[in-house]
Amino acid sequence: MKKTDTENQFLIDDIDKQIMALLKDDARASLKSLASYTYLSSTAVSARIEKLEKAGDIQGYYTRINPENFGLSVRAFINLDLEPIQKKDFYPYVRSCPNVVACNCVTGDYSMLLEVLFASTFELDKFINELQHFGKTKTQIVFSTPVEHRDVLPKDRS
């Protein structure tokens, strides 16, 4: 891991990429396991992980939970046409909604794109009615997800 010109920025080498790929597949992998795959000592792997965390390249470690096991089988994407002045009221509202998985500010005909999970279309409909206080909506219900959310590993830092 070589230092670049920017403070706290490091060039990512092939070993760093390998460590990130291994952690992406199993965030609970032990240092010993990572060391055996990378042919480094556990101490060296730990130091690289710490540097990647400090640089912001590794932002956290997550557990993937199956929402269907908890009765949340209706996944939908909701486009919302929100006026810029409404953002100060909308953002706190949407952050407080536990069924909102993601909320993105986007370009195009709508300004916001929400991903939500609900137990039924009835509950989804109630939520959409609440959202319509902020603006016009357009909803797409997901039938299947051939590619689940995944992190993309970097090729190189520019």
Where are these regions (language model features)?
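A compositional/biophysical signature of low hydrophobicity enriched in polar/charged and small residues
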Residues: 1-158
